[in-house]
Structure formats: structure tokens, C-alpha cells
From Swiss-Prot:
This is Putative ankyrin repeat protein L122. Pfam families: Ank_2. ANK repeats lie at residues 61-94, 98-130, 153-186, 190-223, 228-259, 263-296, 300-333, 337-370, 374-407, 411-444, 448-480, 491-523. The lineage of its organism: Viruses, Varidnaviria, Bamfordvirae, Nucleocytoviricota, Megaviricetes. Keywords: ANK repeat, Repeat. Signal peptide: none annotated. It comes from Acanthamoeba polyphaga mimivirus. It comes from the Viruses.
């Protein structure tokens, strides 16, 4: 029974379980409180005598008194009230705001008098094939909702099991509607018939039973909706689990297992995308056994095999990949953009499962050097996405398998340039470092003549300083130029000048870092620094450049001394090299025992020599590069 207060024309009242709305007539109110009072039915009967004109009024949700009485029969109102309303002229054809008639609503209601009520409605002319605002018929609604949601929720809250008789309610309702003339081939607004909804029921046994009944009663198993999807394709798209028995039923009744929808997807492709539990592994194998073509491609060039690969890998993906390969999938097949499964796998290499997949693909012969339409290899994908959807371990794995670290695209981009370009977000510093450790050349240029260093300086902000420092440590040329395309004209910029004019954060640190690694600032006019540095930074910059100038002078003095001092050291009779050469000559002399002096013995002891042979070996090793 409904627990509500007294009636008010402006009040909000429940019209169905815990759903409330306004614009309630007094007749509707009397119906929802009928079982609250012993004279509830009498009050309804008396009210209709003077207010018969309100019998077909609709509330805020478009529900009539008849709809409320039918939906809540045995809970709030009685079966005899329904009979009274129909006798007094309640219209069975009125639609609520969603376009549903009272008969359409009844197919989803759980009540002992459900079929008695439906008999009354049909006897009064209710249309068994009426369509709501989305062209759904009562038969479609019977399969669209397996059991009343409120009933199921109540069972869950109270800890009660679902009544087995009610579990069969949907099947019974479907058969009832078919017996009363329901058409199983009417299409709703997307072109789906009732069979589309029946096949995707959560209860697989029920899905099979009702689908079989619909087909036996004339339902077209080979019908396609507005997207050119068969029931089988729709089933594989919308469900995470489905039975092989149901698939066999559809195939037995004419469904083409290799039919492609409007965008080229087959049922097998959809199953591979929607593979969320181990049972679907058996389903995929079943479809392959039944002749599903593993090498068909959709409009984007993806095969079923390619559709397995995404950003949510699962525990049993490797066996799925293996079964697909066993049935003839090409591990190096490409989509319309020439992307391979290896490229997709490394792009989404975020966790251990994905790394297992990449390892497996490489072991099975996935080609590292295939290029997509951007001329990228798998290594480019790994470097670009190593910090977002990817994984730095994937970069290392590809390099360990022999990926060319200095491969370049038609635009001249290398993996290092790409990693530097995106090192603030999708890539990271560790990827840049890894590439450099594996021999990436930081001085290779793209077609714009830019190196990894110039790209890092112009593209990065958060990690700019660290990446630049890393590149310089690995001998990036600090005197490289920056080339930027401005309105179709490529302009050349000195890196120091560009930094001082365009970078706001840490520009002084970056300038000093480049100069420390040899960037030439002597040709740059001083006013450029003065105009673009803060006063405090100008003072620091001047002190730093003075120190660097002194360091240069010291280095120059050392270098200038080398030609003079080296001969003096080499040819000095007291130098170590001279003494070693003398000892070598003595050792090879036949009377070496007479020639060796006490000073020679000190050298022999220092070298750890224990006999004449070891003396030969040590002296030869030390003096072979002495000339």
C-alpha cells in the first residue's frame, strides 16, 4: 500500500512504486490508497459517479488512472477496480509521455493478475502491436527488460531469492503476446526487431529459449537493422557473454557468419573487441570452427585479430592470440594506415600483461621495421607514448630485439626527436636517456634541419632543462641552429638568442648550461641579453661568462703547451717512458743480468714482474703505444 497524506491538487504522489509526479487527479489518489482503507473500492466507485469526466486524465508523466491501477494491482489497488474503470470507459489506447499504452506497460509488471489484466485490456481493444515513441512494441519491451527492476532490487535488499515462477515470467509473456497476434518482425527506431533484444538477455538459457520461440513463430533471424547489423553482430557488440548454442541457432536459421555491417565489422570482429571474460575465448574458437573468416577487414582495414589489441588487456589474451594465429591470422597484417598489431601493443604497454603480449608477438615474428603512413616503426609508438598509455620497458624490449635506434622517417624524425618532442607528457626523460644509452645520435637532423636539442628547447617546458642537460651530456652540439617555419618561410635562429627572447622560466639556467657545454655567445650583441634578462640575471650572467672566459684561457694555455712539453717529457732520460724503453732494450739483450741496475729493479718491482717472460709481456703492453 502507498503511504501518503491527504489529497492535494498540487501534491506529488507515487504513480508506480517509488516514482513520484504531480498533476494527480483525486481518482488517481483514491486508487493508490485503495488498500489503505476498508472502503477504498467504494470510495473509487462513489467518486466516479460525479467525476466520470476525469477518468482519462493524465498526470505529469502521462499516466492515466487505469495505468496506475493496472501497474500496482495487488499492491495498492485491486483487480475489481481495473474492471470498474474499463466498464466506466477508461481508454486503453491512451499513451503516456513515452508513448506507451497500458498494455505496453503491463508486459514488464510483476503481479499475480498480470495475464488476467492483459486479457481484459485486449478484450477492450488494446493494440497488441502498438508502438511507443521509439517504435518499440509490447513484445520488444517484454524482451528488453527481463524482470521488473524494482522487484529485483527489493529481492536484493531483503536478501530474498527471485521467485522461480517469476523468473519464467518473460518467456511466458512472450508466448502470450505471440499467441495474441504480436508481430515478431516489427522494427523499432533503429531497425531492430524483438529478436535483437531476446538474443542479448543476460540469462543465456532464457535468451536461447525465447530466441528459438520467436524464430519458430516467424521471426526473421537474418534481419538487419539500420546499421546493417545482423542479430549475431548485435549480440557480439552488446554482450560480454553469450552461448555457442545461441550462435548455432542463428546460423541454423540463415544468419551469415561473415556478414559485414555498415562499417565493415563481422560478428567475429565484434567478439574480439568485446572479449571480457574467458567464456568468450570459447565463443571465438567456435565461430572460427564454423567458418568465420579471420582475414576479412572492416572499413578501416582492421581484421578480427587486430581488434583484440587495445588499452585493456586481459589475463588470457596470449591464448587468444595463439588461437587466432593457429587459424591463419597474419601477425604483420596492416590496417588502412599501415598500423600493425605490434604498434598497437606497444602503444598500450602500460602494465605487465601488455609486456607479455609484446614479448609474445616478437617471439612469433612480428616485424620491428614495418612503417605506417607516418613512416613510423613500432619504436616510434613506444617512444611517443611511454609515459601515457605506454611503458618505457616496451622501448627497451624493442631495442633489445634489434630495433634501429636511429631509424628516421620521411620527414627525418628519429625516435629520439619524437621522445624529446613529447617528454613533458606522453613520453618522458627516461625514454630519452634510454635511447641515448642505446646509441641514439643526438645530432641527426630532420628535414627542417632541427636536432633533438633544438626540438627539446622549443617544444618542452616542464622537463626542458633536464632533457637539454641529458642531450648535452651525450654530446649534442650546443651550437646547432633552430629552424622555424613562419608563414611558409623557414627562419634560422641562434639557440641562445631564441631562448633569451622566447623562454620565460629558467632561461638563465638554460643559457648557462648551453654555454658551459660550448655554445658560442661571442658573436651575439650584448644588448640582446640586457634587454631580455632581469637586472639580477644580467649580473649573474656577466659573472658566469667572465668565469667561462677565464676557463677558456686556461684551456688554451694548456693546449698551446702540449706541442712543446710532450717531446720534453717523452725524450727526457729521467722520464718513466725513457726508463721503460731502456729496460726493454736491456731485457732483450743476451747479458741482461749484467745490464740491469738498482733503479731498473725498482721499476720491475713496481710492475709486479716475477720472471723474464712476465717482464717481456708487461713492457710490451706498456710501450706499444709509446711512440
Amino acid at each position: 500500500m502507498a503511504h501518503v497524506g491527504n489529497y492535494s491538487r498540487n501534491g506529488y504522489y507515487p504513480y508506480y512504486n517509488n516514482k513520484f509526479c504531480g498533476n494527480f487527479t483525486e481518482l488517481m489518489y483514491l486508487i493508490i490508497v485503495e488498500k489503505n482503507r476498508s472502503d477504498g473500492y467504494s470510495n473509487i466507485k462513489k467518486h466516479l459517479v460525479d467525476n466520470i469526466e476525469t477518468i482519462n486524465y493524465r498526470n505529469e508523466k502521462g499516466w492515466t488512472a487505469l495505468m496506475i491501477a493496472c501497474a500496482m494491482c495487488d499492491k495498492w489497488s485491486s483487480f475489481k477496480t481495473i474492471r470498474l474503470l474499463l466498464k466506466k470507459g477508461a481508454d486503453v489506447h491512451i499513451e503516456n509521455n513515452k508513448g506507451r499504452t497500458v498494455l505496453s506497460l503491463m508486459v514488464n509488471i510483476i503481479t499475480e493478475n498480470k495475464f488476467n489484466i492483459m486479457d481484459l485490456l485486449i478484450d477492450k481493444g488494446a493494440d497488441i502491436n502498438s508502438q511507443d515513441n521509439k517504435n518499440k512494441t509490447p513484445l520488444i519491451h517484454a524482451c528488453k527488460k527481463e524482470l521488473d527492476d524494482t522487484y529485483l532490487h527489493a529481492c536484493y535488499v531483503l536478501g530474498k531469492s527471485v521467485d522461480p515462477n517469476l523468473e519464467k515470467n518473460d518467456s511466458k509473456t512472450v508466448r502470450y503476446l505471440l499467441d495474441k497476434g504480436a508481430d515478431p518482425n516489427i522494427e523499432e527506431h533503429y531497425g531492430k526487431t524483438v529478436l535483437f533484444y531476446a538474443a542479448r538477455m543476460k540469462n543465456q538459457d532464457k535468451a536461447y529459449e525465447i530466441s528459438k520461440t520467436l524464430i519458430e513463430r516467424g521471426g526473421n533471424a537474418n534481419h538487419t537493422n539500420h546499421y546493417a547489423e545482423t542479430v549475431l553482430i548485435y549480440l557480439c557488440i552488446s554482450c560480454s557473454h553469450y552461448s555457442c548454442e545461441l550462435i548455432q541457432l542463428l546460423l541454423d536459421n540463415g544468419v551469415d557468419i561473415n556478414h559485414q555491417n555498415r562499417i565493415g565489422f563481422t560478428a567475429l570482429m565484434c567478439a574480439c573487441i568485446n572479449i571480457k571474460n574467458p567464456s568468450n575465448f570459447e565463443t571465438i574458437k567456435f565461430m572460427l570452427d564454423k567458418g568465420a573468416n579471420i582475414n576479412l577487414k572492416n572499413n578501416d582495414g582492421f581484421t578480427a585479430f587486430m581488434n583484440i589489441f587495445g588499452n585493456n588487456y586481459f589475463d588470457y589474451i596470449v591464448p587468444v592470440i595463439q588461437i587466432m594465429l593457429d587459424y591463419g591470422a597474419d601477425i604483420n597484417d596492416k590496417n588502412n594506415n599501415n598500423v600493425t598489431v605490434l604498434m598497437m601493443a606497444v602503444k598500450f604497454a602500460k602494465n605487465d600483461k601488455n609486456m607479455t603480449v609484446i614479448n609474445f608477438l616478437l617471439d612469433k615474428g612480428a616485424d620491428l621495421e614495418i612503417r605506417n603512413d607516418y613512416d613510423w616503426t613500432a619504436l616510434f609508438y613506444a617512444c611517443r607514448y611511454s609515459n601515457s598509455s605506454g611503458n618505457n620497458d616496451a622501448v627497451k624490449l624493442l631495442l633489445d630485439y634489434g630495433a634501429n635506434v636511429n631509424v628516421n622517417t620521411l620527414l627525418g624524425h628519429t625516435p629520439l626527436i619524437i621522445a624529446c618532442q613529447y617528454a613533458d607528457n606522453e613520453s618522458n626523460i627516461d625514454t630519452v636517456k634510454l635511447l641515448l644509452e642505446y646509441g641514439a645520435n643526438p645530432n641527426l637532423t630532420n628535414l627542417d634541419k632541427n636536432t633533438a636539442l633544438s626540438v627539446a628547447i622549443t617544444w618542452l617546458s616542464k622537463n626542458r632543462y633536464e632533457v637539454v642537460k641529458l642531450l648535452l651530456y651525450y654530446h649534442a652540439d650546443s651550437n646547432t641552429y633552430l629552424y622555424l617555419n613562419s608563414e611558409g618561410t623557414v627562419r634560422e635562429y641562434n639557440l641562445l638568442v631564441w631562448i633569451v627572447k622566447n623562454i620565460k622560466c629558467n632561461k638563465l639556467d638554460l643559457l648557462m648550461l648551453l654555454i658551459e657545454h660550448g655554445a658560442n655567445y661571442s658573436d651575439i650583441k650584448g644588448y640582446i641579453f640586457q634587454e631580455n634578462l632581469d637586472n639580477g640575471d644580467i649580473e649573474k650572467f656577466m659573472k658566469f661568462t667572465n668565469i667561462m672566459e677565464n676557463i677558456k684561457l686556461v684551456k688554451k694555455s694548456i693546449i698551446d703547451c702540449i706541442p712543446k712539453r710532450v717531446p720534453e717529457i717523452i725524450f727526457n732520460t729521467n722520464s718513466m717512458i725513457s726508463q721503460l724503453l731502456s729496460l726493454k732494450w736491456k731485457a732483450y739483450s743476451s747479458d741482461y743480468k749484467d745490464l740491469i741496475t738498482l733503479k731498473d729493479l725498482d721499476i720491475i718491482d713496481y710492475l709486479g714482474v716475477y720472471d723474464i717472460d712476465s717482464l717481456y709481456d708487461r713492457i710490451i703492453d706498456i710501450t706499444k703505444y709509446a711512440y
